[in-house]
Amino acid sequence: MTSTEGTGGGDGKGISGFSDIERRSILDPHLSVLELLRRPSDTRPHEALKGEVSDIVGNCAGTTGTGNGSISQSWQTIHRNDSCLSVVPERCPSQATAAGILSSSDTSEDEPDAVNSPSAVHQQLHATPPQKHTKSLEDYRSLNVGIPLVLPEDSNNINNNNKNGSTTGSNGEEDDNDTITKSLNSSSNSFIMPKLSLSQKTQKFRILVLGRPGLKFYHSIPKKYQHMFELPRSHDPAEFKQYTGILVVFQELKEMVSLLNRVCQCNPNRPVIPVCQSGQRQQVRNLLESLLKNRLVSLLYPPVVVNNQPDLLGMFRFLQELSKTVSDNSDMDAEEPNNGSKRLKRSLQRKKKKFIETSAERNGRPHKKRHNNEKVNRWVLWGVSLTLGVGVGYCISHLVSSTWISLTTNPLGPVDPESVSKDLFVFDRQELKLGEMDMDSDHPFGHALFLFKQALKQWNLAVKQFLGRHLSCMERIGPANCLEWPTSDEHTNRVLALGYVML
């Protein structure tokens, strides 16, 4: 027995020494990780492995049995932390969602309660009876997976616990469930609805068709222009403010007067377009003239005969152009809010002026018309007239002065033969150089031209003396600014030409 025990003890020592060698290294050089994990565990007693496993799983070591002998000594360096038992490294989606919803204020209050209060993990571990057989590393892995998750308890349970055991809570604190609801509502309403302002509406061009034959006239309008017209919805004059103008269709003048009275009740007044029957245009014009003078109504377009298709098409084109102007102006309301009303007012004034002119022509009143051919720039006419006047005046003054001089000059005498050597001709004791002698003076035409030039010169001198007498007062006012007339013929001609221009 002794030898057997000694042998058994020697074998036990040999086995323990071999296991100590195996525990020094995690991996064997000739074995894979899977084979290392499936290696059979040693048969050490339960008390020997209890100290090693207790550093890993805490209180679970006393109830779950011995661990695998292949776990190395590096696992023993992990210190015990009881607060980590409620923390699972692998989180499920429900736990992640719950952690995202809860606020940071809740975790600080629940941490000490989770450590002190017995959780489901503690109850499960203590309730498990101790087992004598050993478990491998796979058993511990399955044990970790089987640990239930510690999720936040229901609000009803929390309230019951607070009523039974807790005395630190106050009545003024908000419940966790309410806090979660508020945070979800505030996060979901992140979109802010912009404020819409209906104070400035876009101006739309619309013409109201008013009168008993209005429905028939509306259906006779071409489809191209029908979108600009609308039929009345009621007989209230306050409805007229929504329209740009009012088209009045009538059969008798009494209807026209009653319709215009309704239009006058609208403030501000809307411009009208009268559509009369054949033979009523002149009467309608006379009636409208009195209303326009008193500013009771305004005219958008002259009266149109309902059977006259060219006049109707002209009215439709005018309204279409006016609608484009109003629509273009509505895009610029932020910069120029009153620009559309000004343009509409200008167009109404032009149409009103045209209507008055046509009515004056029909009544036989004289009216001045300006054709396109007469729209010539006046400055061009004035420039051409001044140029022609100066040129003609200069020519006349030159001819008159030359003729006057030739007439007043004494005739030439006989030539003195003694002056030939001196390049001079002496005529009646007057010397004349060769360069100054007129070779054409023997001809009658040349002599007449010479006399005409001399006459113009003499006329120039006479006019100069006449102007000098009337301008002598300037010498008395300012002797420094006295008018000194030049003696040469060139200056004389210029002064005479200036006199003609001034005249």
From Swiss-Prot:
Residue ranges annotated as compositionally biased, kind Polar residues, are 116-126
Stretches with biased composition (Basic residues): 342-354
Q: What's the chief localization of this chain?
A: mitochondrion
Compartment(s): Mitochondrion outer membrane; Vacuole membrane; Preautophagosomal structure membrane
Q: Which UniProt keywords apply?
A: Autophagy, Membrane, Mitochondrion, Mitochondrion outer membrane, Transmembrane, Transmembrane helix, Vacuole
Compositional bias segments (type: Basic and acidic residues): 355-364
What does UniProt give as GO cellular component? Answer: mitochondrial outer membrane; phagophore assembly site membrane; vacuolar membrane
Membrane topology category: Single-pass membrane protein
Q: Where are the compositionally biased (Low complexity) regions?
A: 155-171
Looking at the UniProt entry, the stretches that span the membrane are 380-396
Q: Name one GO biological process term.
A: autophagy
Where is the stretch described as Disordered? Answer: 98-138, 151-186, 328-370
User: What protein family does this chain belong to?
Assistant: Belongs to the ATG32 family.
According to its UniProt entry, what is the function of this protein? Mitophagy-specific receptor that recruits the autophagic machinery to mitochondria and regulates selective degradation of mitochondria. Mitophagy contributes to regulate mitochondrial quantity and quality by eliminating the mitochondria to a basal level to fulfill cellular energy requirements and preventing excess ROS production. Recruits ATG11 to the surface of mitochondria. Also promotes autophagy-dependent peroxisome degradation.
What is the name listed in the Swiss-Prot or TrEMBL entry for this protein?
Answer: Autophagy-related protein 32
**Organism in which the protein naturally occurs:** Zygosaccharomyces rouxii (strain ATCC 2623 / CBS 732 / NBRC 1130 / NCYC 568 / NRRL Y-229)
Its gene is ATG32
